[in-house]
Each structure stands twice: as C-alpha cells, then as structure tokens.
A protein has these predicted regions:
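Glycine-rich loops and low-complexity Gly/Arg-rich segments
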Residues: 19-22, 57-61, 141-146
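Short, low-complexity, polybasic intrinsically disordered segments
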Residues: 45-71
C-alpha cells in the first residue's frame, strides 16, 4: 500500500513522463486507463459518536482517512484530465468535474480515457448488489483490511459487482 492507494495516476506518470522509458503519447485516443477498486467505506460519523471518541480511537482511524483522501485526490485529478464515462462525485463543491476538463482540445476529449470501477461497502449498496441484509458489524468486518475472514464474502461481492458493471454508486 502506498499513499496513492489508487495507483492509476502514478501509472499514468510512469507511462508518459520523460524520466521513465515508455513515453506514451497523451490523448484520449492513445491511452485507456482502467482502474478497478477494492471497495470503499463511507465516513459517516454522527455528532454523538464523534464527541465520545478519545485520542486512541481517532489515531486508529487516521490510516483509513489518509488512504481515502489520497484515493479521492487521485480520482479528482484523473477525472479532471480525462474523458471519463464512470465519473464519481468527488464532493459537494466540485461534483464530478464533467464541466472542468483540462484540455485545449475543442472536442473536449481529454488527455486520456479513464474508467474507474469501484463500489461503496455499506449496507444499502450491499443489499442492492447481493440481495441480502448486512448488519453494521458485518459491514465493518468487510471494510477492515486486516480481517482475512472476510475474503470469501468480498470475493462474492467482487463477482457480483463485476456482473453489474461495478458502477453501483457512480454518478
């Protein structure tokens, strides 16, 4: 795991920058970058829970906060640069960046074609995808990266997401 979390932007840099040996030409017609995520959790803390947290609770959550922030930052940059049919809403201010494409191209094709497939690991999304209810504990267990016991359920979720286009929550 790196701070990139979603390594797509790093891969684009390796493929195109002069310091690396590949020197691919930029352009939506030249580069198709497909990124497949592993699922992600939502940070939804209600005020009562937050006010009851101690420093140790907060410290244990910092790695996930940093990884999610890095992933969303990379996602925003790639959507900003690209022709992207799988745009995700980044936040309430910038949305999905569909109207903010960086290019001088009058056709607005972008500097690459980028696709991001991922899904929220939350009870409503999982119910829709798997046609069964998940408790808060079950969802928490799925999200916990070090919980090897979840690997079989995560595999089933991944298969179902692939069959459904992995666009359960993309906008």
């Amino acid at each position: 795991v790196s701070m990139a979390n979603n390594p797509s932007l790093q891969l684009l840099m390796v493929a195109t920058l002069k310091g690396f040996p590949f020197h691919w030409r930029m352009g939506a017609e030249n580069i198709l970058l497909v990124s497949v995520g592993t699922g992600m959790s939502k940070w939804e803390k209600i005020p009562q829970k937050v006010s009851k947290q101690n420093l140790l609770n907060w410290a244990s959550q910092i790695p996930d906060m940093l990884m999610q922030d890095a992933s969303w930052h990379n996602q925003a940059i790639l959507q900003w640069l690209s022709n992207c049919d799988t745009r995700w809403s980044i936040d309430g201010e910038i949305g999905d960046l569909a109207d903010d494409l960086i290019t001088n191209d009058p056709d607005k094709k972008g500097l690459l074609t980028y696709l991001r497939y991922n899904l929220w690991l939350d009870a409503p999304t999982l119910k829709q995808l798997m046609n069964k209810d998940y408790t808060t504990k079950q969802v928490d267990d799925l999200v916990e990266m070090s919980n090897a016991d979840s690997r079989f359920e995560l595999y089933k979720i991944g298969e179902a997401a692939a069959k459904n286009g992995a666009q359960v929550n993309a906008t």
